[in-house]
Design a protein with these regions (language model features):
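The feature represents the first ordered module of a protein
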Residues: 2-72
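Generic alpha-helix signal with a bias toward terminal, lower-confidence helices
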Residues: 31, 42-44, 71-74, 95-103, ...
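Short helix/strand-capping connector loops at secondary-structure junctions
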Residues: 69-83
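Short, compact, well-ordered microdomains
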Residues: 79-110
Length: 110
């Protein structure tokens, strides 16, 4: 399972996981951290959900790494698009689905 939600405080991640797909040479790294609500992080959450190759190529990434400038984004090899933020749990479920579909479609067994 990709990233099990857990209770946490502002200093602990809600999700912090890494998964290797050795047969496809791809990785997943997910971090969701509670942060103080602010203008930059009105939802009180900072996150990065990355799926890519070990060589550093991005296949899929969701993040809010630059909230003052960009907000919530979806990154793929085709470019970056702004997205509506449905909440981190919903976004994590979407990310899980997309990763597993990609792994299945590219012949990975995990």
């Amino acid at each position: 399972m990709l990233g099990n939600p857990s209770e946490g405080s502002e200093t602990e991640p809600l999700v912090d996981t890494r998964i290797d797909f050795p047969e496809s040479d791809r990785i997943v790294a997910v971090t969701v951290r509670r942060v103080p609500e602010s203008e930059a992080y009105p939802d009180g959450v900072k996150y990065a959900m990355h799926y890519g190759t070990r060589a550093g190529e991005t296949i899929l990434r969701y993040d809010n790494a630059h909230p003052e400038e960009k907000g919530h984004e979806r990154h793929t090899p085709d470019g970056t698009t702004e997205i509506d933020f449905p909440g981190w749990e919903v976004l994590l479920a979407r990310f899980r689905t997309e990763v597993m579909e990609h792994e299945r479609d590219t012949g990975s067994t995990e």
